From Swiss-Prot:
It is an enzyme of class 2 (transferase). Its main location: cytoplasm. It catalyses: a fatty acyl-[ACP] + phosphate = an acyl phosphate + holo-[ACP]. Belongs to the PlsX family. Pfam families: FA_synthesis (PF02504). Pathway: Lipid metabolism; phospholipid metabolism. Homodimer. Probably interacts with PlsY. GO terms for biological process: fatty acid biosynthetic process; phospholipid biosynthetic process. Catalyzes the reversible formation of acyl-phosphate (acyl-PO(4)) from acyl-[acyl-carrier-protein] (acyl-ACP). This enzyme utilizes acyl-ACP as fatty acyl donor, but not acyl-CoA. GO terms for cellular component: cytoplasm. Its EC number is 2.3.1.274. This is Phosphate acyltransferase. The keyword Cell membrane does not apply.
Length: 348
């Protein structure tokens, strides 16, 4: 299956210096993926010249003369940057020239511009950011990670549907389990929105595990973890900070004395294996679900390996038919809910 992906070459902390070589290398390893490099032609051409690569049938340039700054307000970018590399790349999906877009640019601007250009899938009120996090047993998908700070119970249900569909489409895992992130497992725990969301999940026909707590994320208790964007973003950033702290502690201990340095040399193979297992770069690429097109947000500081992982994520979603499957599942589950849902139950 031939796939064409549009790359926002100007986005991110490193811009074309990372995005262009990463896209070219990915294309060389996947003979069924075509690349459109979107951005300032003269800048992209310099990067291609350095790689000794020329545009061809599988690699082409598409000009865009504006760049969305990493700290630019989303509304300003949407209103004033109509020829930005980000917006032009998204327009390529809308026109049918590409099936996916990858950007390491301004997250808020990408959210706003994606929603404006592509619109949401029927039955989806708001798009959500989904990321993969490592767990004891493998990995889990968590959404939302910051696109929606204030959510209704219906929004959380939609996130669950999209997350479960993503897992089943990309990983060929039927009936993935869904957990609702809460302050406790009991039904009486949580605010009214979370309680109502739990009722909706139970009536949906989805494989709803129930309420889960923060530690369940990394235990791998469920395949999908659902929460609002405020909770999800705090959980993600806390996890990143904890990982940095533990790595710092480990370095300090191994440098503390000559003996600890020698111990570090002996333990080096184990340490390297551990690093590979928890390497966050392999999970780079947040899926912006709920749009009429595949959009992947790469981390702004991603290196070449991490950006290639984001491209791979986009290709997997297209090949798995994630967009089509979400549309079908939304319609099916909406019919189920209309037929089966009971009146809200008051929990004292």
């Amino acid at each position: 299956m031939n796939i064409t992906v549009a790359i926002d070459c100007m986005g991110g902390d490193h811009g074309p210096h990372i995005t262009v070589p990463s896209a070219v290398e990915y294309m060389h390893h996947d003979c069924e993926t075509n690349i459109i490099l979107v951005g300032k032609p003269e800048v992209i051409s310099r990067e291609l010249d350095a790689l000794k690569v020329s545009p061809g049938s599988r690699l082409r340039l598409h000009p865009a003369n504006e760049v969305v700054g990493m700290d630019e307000h989303p509304a300003v970018a949407l209103r004033n940057k109509k020829d930005s590399s980000m917006r032009v790349a998204l327009n390529l999906i809308k026109s049918g020239e590409a099936q996916a877009c990858i950007s390491a640019g301004n997250t808020g601007a990408l959210l706003a511009t994606s929603r404006f250009v592509l619109k949401t899938i029927p039955g989806i009120d708001r798009p959500a950011l989904a990321v993969i996090l490592p767990t004891i047993s493998g990995h889990t998908y968590v959404l939302d990670l910051g696109a929606n700070v204030n959510c209704t119970a219906e929004h959380l249900l939609q996130f669950g549907i999209m997350g479960a569909t993503l897992v089943s489409s990309v990983e060929n895992k039927p009936n993935p389990s869904i957990g609702l992130l809460n302050v406790g497992e009991e039904d009486i725990k949580g605010n009214d929105v979370v309680k109502r969301a739990a009722e909706l999940f139970r009536s949906s026909g989805l494989n709803f595990y129930g309420n889960i707590e923060g530690d369940d994320i990394y235990r791998g208790t469920t395949n999908v973890v659902v929460c609002d964007g405020f909770v999800g973003n705090v959980a993600l950033k806390t996890s990143e900070g904890l990982a940095q702290m533990l790595a710092s502690y480990l370095r300090e201990e191994f440098r503390r004395s000559l003996f600890s340095r020698l111990a570090g040399l002996v333990a080096l193979p184990v340490i390297n294996a551990f690093r590979r297992r928890v390497d966050h770069r392999q999970y780079n690429g947040a899926s912006l679900l709920g749009l009429r097109g595949v959009v992947i947000k790469s981390h702004g500081s991603a290196d070449s390996y991490a950006f290639r992982c984001a491209i791979r994520r986009a290709v997997e979603e297209v090949r798995g038919g994630t967009l089509r499957n979400i549309v079908e599942h939304i319609e099916t589950l909406r019919n189920n809910i209309e037929q089966n849902i009971a009146q809200p139950v008051s929990i004292e």
